[in-house]
Amino acid sequence: MAETQRPRSAIIVGAGAGGIAVAARLAKAGVDVTVLEKNDFTGGRCSLIHTKAGYRFDQGPSLLLLPGLFRETFEDLGTTLEQEDVELLQCFPNYNIWFSDGKRFSPTTDNATMKVEIEKWEGPDGFRRYLSWLAEGHQHYETSLRHVLHRNFKSILELADPRLVVTLLMALHPFESIWHRAGRYFKTDRMQRVFTFATMYMGMSPFDAPATYSLLQYSELAEGIWYPRGGFHKVLDALVKIGERMGVKYRLNTGVSQVLTDGGKNGKKPKATGVQLENGEVLNADLVVVNADLVYTYNNLLPKEIGGIKKYANKLNNRKASCSSISFYWSLSGMAKELETHNIFLAEEYKESFDAIFERQALPDDPSFYIHVPSRVDPSAAPPDRDAVIALVPVGHLLQNGQPELDWPTLVSKARAGVLATIQARTGLSLSPLITEEIVNTPYTWETKFNLSKGAILGLAHDFFNVLAFRPRTKAQGMDNAYFVGASTHPGTGVPIVLAGAKITAEQILEETFPKNTKVPWTTNEERNSERMRKEMDEKITEEGIIMRSNSSKPGRRGSDAFEGAMEVVNLLSQRAFPLLVALMGVLYFLLFVR
């Protein structure tokens, strides 16, 4: 394809959140897009389970966080959630969080309620400390949006910017665990638990996860937790329809066996030329975007004869993965009125429960778990006067290292008994007699149904050396016209994060494969960041603690001024000190991921 010629066609492998979103974006740019999906449904993990008796379950995600990223996706495509008949229902309270003695805490976006609840546990100055913690979460949130979720990291050289690196280190606290960081603000062990468990959204222990991820609970407490009427898949179904209006074609029940290339011509990198289906059919295209699990893709779909792919696949196999889950989907003959839409049951042995998952890849003896009752906020999820209940129990991922796998049937029975006993002990609800039908997803289910390596439901982990420029690239190693979108590539896991990644991937494709000076048909990340910086540079802390707090040591000086002052010092030092830092990071990256 000549450099001046735009790609006419694209194949997307996988109809998960990222594949659906990038398909619509490329179609808006004028590309003829075909999406291939091995299952008979779209949405990937973000799909629905329906029973003949009229119950509906969210198979995967059930909490809609970071609503701004969803709205941004729809607006970039020339529409809105409301225009596409997506109704978001806010959950009040956010959760009920149950402790082992039957006491509970119910976080909410209402600060007056939070003041009363927090001071019960933390004393008279507890709410002030909570506001300070919330302000820091806002800082993590805004910095991440601007410098991580709206920015591509095509190589380690992307970090060769002293202002960026110092911003990330100063503003995101990446080398301090969220558990330790929370201890700076909360005196009681229980409040530390309340404000750290959300790292499980990233498939990580709060004792290992960077403090950066307090942005998740900031989002919950500042923006709320939402649920789309009709199920989480309603959002992705709307994106499918938007894409179809622009010409995107979906082929379900269509498995892909390999990505094809031209083999490389005249000493150039091989280019992706299409795919071969499991039935042997060959489909040609100018470019290929893979939304399948990235570790699975490198091991099974990309040609191993291309230099570096086999070696990189082996490296990915040894990267730290997120957890898996045993998920129960229960149809009830009545209503579980003791349960809210979202319920968290925290283990008494909090740290030990995470160690069992992430260090021993096992089921904890006393697990923390999540209960979702979609029919509490959206009655259409179950027949009248009945409830649909989902119990998600985090567990270790499959080993796949030559060691014997755990006895998962026994662990499923143990998990079920533990969940039912804990619910009854803490709430008084005897759930077992109400269950009329059960569906179970185990780590093996996640692996086989969605091609998730090791059954890890959230892809690769999100520790420091698995994010930013250290996370797998959005473009395939050693190939042209082959790209990725999804949980294990940049910027990371979770539906809103993957939607942000779809924008990053689409913009990279337009930059690298379209003629120069081609106008991107939406507000680009660069343009959005510039606008955000203009609007937010002078924000100040408010009484509610929602605005970024000043870190200035000089009375009367705003945080943005102090930060700019720090940047001036950084600029003065960068000519001598920073090249050494970049060199050291490059050596470390080579030792960890290349050698």
From Swiss-Prot:
Subcellular location: Membrane
Function: Phytoene desaturase involved in the carotenoid biosynthesis pathway. Converts phytoene into 3,4-didehydrolycopene via the intermediates phytofluene, zeta-carotene, neurosporene and lycopene, by introducing up to five double bonds into phytoene. Is also able to desaturate 1-hydroxyneurosporene into 1-hydroxylycopene and 1-hydroxylycopene into 1-hydroxy-3,4-didehydrolycopene. Gamma-carotene and 1,19-dihydroxylycopene are not accepted as substrates. Neurosporaxanthin is synthesized from geranyl-geranyl pyrophosphate (GGPP) through several enzymatic activities.
One GO biological process term: carotenoid biosynthetic process
SUPFAM superfamilies linked to this entry: FAD/NAD(P)-binding domain
Annotated keywords: Carotenoid biosynthesis, Membrane, NAD, Oxidoreductase, Signal, Transmembrane, Transmembrane helix
Membrane-traversing stretches: 574-594
Gene3D superfamilies recorded: FAD/NAD(P)-binding domain (3.50.50.60)
Stated name of the protein: Phytoene desaturase
Induction: The expression is subject to photoinduction.
PROSITE patterns membership: PHYTOENE_DH
Stated family: Belongs to the carotenoid/retinoid oxidoreductase family.
Disulfide bonds: none
Cofactor(s) of this protein: NAD(+)
UniProt EC number: 1.3.99.-
Pathway listed: Carotenoid biosynthesis; lycopene biosynthesis
Main localization of the protein described in the UniProt heading: membrane
Membrane topology according to the record: Single-pass membrane protein
Catalysed reactions listed for this entry: 15-cis-phytoene + A = all-trans-phytofluene + AH2; all-trans-phytofluene + A = all-trans-zeta-carotene + AH2; all-trans-zeta-carotene + A = all-trans-neurosporene + AH2; all-trans-neurosporene + A = all-trans-lycopene + AH2
Gene Ontology CC: one annotated term: membrane
